[in-house]
C-alpha cells in the first residue's frame, strides 16, 4: 500500500504535497498526521484517487485526467494485491457527477472548498453509521454545508440562549434551515472512530429534502459561468492574487511549500481553482469564505479572493513587525547588558569603581560608624554578621536583596539618639494654652510629667489615654504636647487594625516583609524618644492574623518595652523613652489588660462658655481669614454664636460648630462677590476652609500665633488666675438658654442683611443678576454694606434649628419629673412620666414604654417597689399602688435608653402621681436606687450639670458619693445652682415635695 501511495505521489507530486495544508486551514493547521494516518489505515485506493488539488501538473485537462486514471488504476491494483485492504476496495465507485441526493453534513467552522481535505467529528451515531453503510455500497460521497447563524444574531458573538441549540441536536427541517444552500460535494476518504475525513470535489446547491434523519437532500451540481481564459482583467487579477500570495510567503513561512507549488506551476492551474486556493488558505471569516464558495462568476470570485489574501498579507506584515520589534528589543537588552558588564570589568581592573556589594557594605558601615558609641553591642554584632553574609551572596540572588533591606533598616534606626527635651513648665503652659482652650485636666497632667522630668534630669516614657467624644481635641492636643516637650511627633491610627504584623512586623522569610509601625516610626522621626499618638485605640479589630490588642500589651508596658522585639528586625529595641498618647471615644471598648497599662484622662467636652470662647477667638477668626473676608465686611455676633451652639451644635466637641461657622462665611463670601467685592490677596496662600487644614476637626480650636489679634497674648502665658477671671467675665452667657429671648448687642448702622437680600433664589435669577450688575456700576465707589449675622437671621444661613428646647414644662405637672442623662453628645435632660391606667382592688401593676433597656426596666421595677414602701410610710392610708395600674413612659420613644441612674427619678414620678402633688419647680435629679432606698453614685456629673444649666434648672439632686466629682468642676459651671447630695431616698422626698427638712447644699 505504501508503494501504491508512492506511485500516486510520483504522478501527482503537487497534489499530494499541497493537500495536507488545505486541511490544516480548517483545524489547527497541522493535518499531515491525519493524512498519513489515513494512508496507513487501509484507505489507499480512495485516498490515492482523490488526494489531489484541482489543477493538474500536466499540460491540459485531458492529459491530467488520463494521468489521474493511470494513478487510480495503479493504486487499485496495489490495493487488490494487499490482503488487509481488499475489503475497502470497491471495483466500481459512483462517479461524483452521478450524485443527485446526498447526506447533508453540517460544517460549523469553515466551508469546504473543492480539492481540499477537511476532518470533521460526527457525534450522531446514526449519521455516522449511514456514512459507513454508503461507503460499503460504493457511495463514498456526502454534501458538506456551512452552518449559518440564526437571524438577528451577531455572527461574532457566541450566545447561550435556549434557541441556540447544538448543531448536533438539530434534525430534519430545523437542521436544513440552519444550513447554507450552497455547499461542496465531499468524498469520504476515511472514517476512524467519530472522525470523518472529507475531500471536496465540486459545488452543490440544495433543492429539497429527501429524508429527515439522517438529513438527506437533493442537490444540483453548480458549474462556473463561462469565461474567457485570455481575458486580460482575469489574468491581471489572478497574477495579483499570485503576487499577493508570494508576499504572504515572504512575511510568513506557514504556507511556504503550498504557495511555492502554485506559483511555480501557475500556467497549469485554472483560474477558479486559484481563487478557491487563496480563500481556503486564508484565515478569513467563515462567512467571507462562504461568499467565495457561492460565487460562480470567475472574475468576481478572484476579486473576493484577492481581498481576503490582501488582508492576510497585512496581518502577516503586522505579525512580522511585532516579531521584529521584540527581537530588536531583546537583542538590544542583551547588547546593553554585555556592554555594562564589560564596562564594570574594565573599571574594576583600573580601580575606578568597586562592585555593588562593596559599595553597599561601605555605605552601611559609614552609617553605623556615626552611631557606634551609642549603638548596643548586640546590634553591632548582628550588623557585622549580616555584612559578612552580604559579601558571600550573589547580587542576583533573592537572599541578597533580603539581606540588603535588613541591613538598611538596622543601620538607619536612631540607636541611642535622643532629642533634647524642654522641661520649662512655663513654656509648656504657654504652648498648651495657645493651642487649646480648656482641657485643664490634660494640661495639668502634662505639666506634672514635665515637672518630674525636671527634678530627675531625665524623663521616662509614659502611656496616657485621652478618652472623650469626637471633636474635643484629643488628636490635636497630642501634637501640642510634643511641641511643648520639644519631642518629635508621630501618629498612626489602629482603628480597624486586624493584623498583628502591622505592630510587630513580618518575619523576614516572607516576600515583601516589612517592620512594624514602631520601627517605621523610629526611622521616620530619627530619634529614640518621640511622642507617639496611637489614635482610635478603642476600635482595634481582630482577625485570623491574631489579636492586635494583645500585641500592644508588650508595646505599652513600661516594664517590657525596654526590650521590644520586632519580628522583622529580630533584635531588641529600647522604647522606654517613648511617650505614648492614646485616644479613644469609649474606654469600655478597650480590653481590660490593655486598659490597665494606661493612665486614663477623661475629656468630658466643652461647656457653653468654652465653646463661645473657642468660636469667637479661634474658629470665627480663622474661618473668616480662610474665606478672604475682612473684619469690616462681615461680623457674626455673640448672640448668633450662642444660638448656634445651643440650637445647632450641642455635641461635646466643636467640630460641628466649626462646620456651621464655615457654612455661614461661605454664604457671606458668595453674597459679597455678587455685590462686586474683590479683595486683594494679602498673602500668597490658597483660600481654603478651616476643615481642610491638615489636622482636621480636632485642630479647629487651635489658636495660631499669626491669627491672634491681641499682641499681648503672643508673648505671655495665660495663668490659672487669668483663665479664671476670663471665665468669670463670660458667666452671663451661661445664664442665657434657648428658651429665653436672646437680644443681640446693638448693631452698627451699616445695615443688617435681611432675609430678602439673602434669598439665593432671587440672586440666581437673570433679573437678579442684572439688578446686581446695574447696582455695581452705579455704586462702584461706594463702600459695601457690612454683613451682620445675629440670632434673628441666623436661620437664613444654617437652616432651621436642629435641637429644640429640652425643657417641656415650666412647672412639671403631677406624675412628671425631670431627670438627667448622659449621651455620646454630652449631657441631656430626660423626663419620666407616669399616669394611672386602671383602678380597682388588687389591680396594682406597672407598664413601661419608651424603648427601655433591660437595666432601665429593672430600675423601674425597683422604683415601683421602693415607692410603695415609702408611700406606706408617709401616707399609710393611701392604697394607690395596691389598687392602681401605673403606666411609666420615657419620652423620645425612638431613642434607645438604658442605665440605672434614673431610679430616683422614677420613684419621685410615681410618688407624685400617688399623692397628687407636683414636684418642686426647676428641679432635676439623678441617682441609682436600691431596694432599701439607698442612692448609689452615677457617672457623667459634668455633662449632666451642663445639661441642667442649659435647661434653666435651679436645683439638682446628686448622690452623696458624687460630691467629690462635683467639687472638681470649674466654678463657672457650678455657680448659680442649688445642689443637694443625698444618701437615701427619704432626703430626695423632702426636697422634691418641699419638706422643711434640709440637706447639705453646695
From Swiss-Prot:
SMART domains the UniProt entry points to: AAA (SM00382), LON (SM00464)
UniProt keyword ATP-binding, yes or no: yes
Gene Ontology biological process: cellular response to oxidative stress; chaperone-mediated protein complex assembly; mitochondrion organization; oxidation-dependent protein catabolic process; protein quality control for misfolded or incompletely synthesized proteins
Active site: 901, 944
Domain Lon N-terminal, residue spans: 102-313
Subcellular locations according to the entry: Mitochondrion matrix
Record-stated family: Belongs to the peptidase S16 family.
Subunit and interaction comment: Homohexamer or homoheptamer. Organized in a ring with a central cavity.
More info: This protein may be expected to contain an N-terminal transit peptide but none has been predicted.
Protein's name according to its UniProt entry: Lon protease homolog, mitochondrial
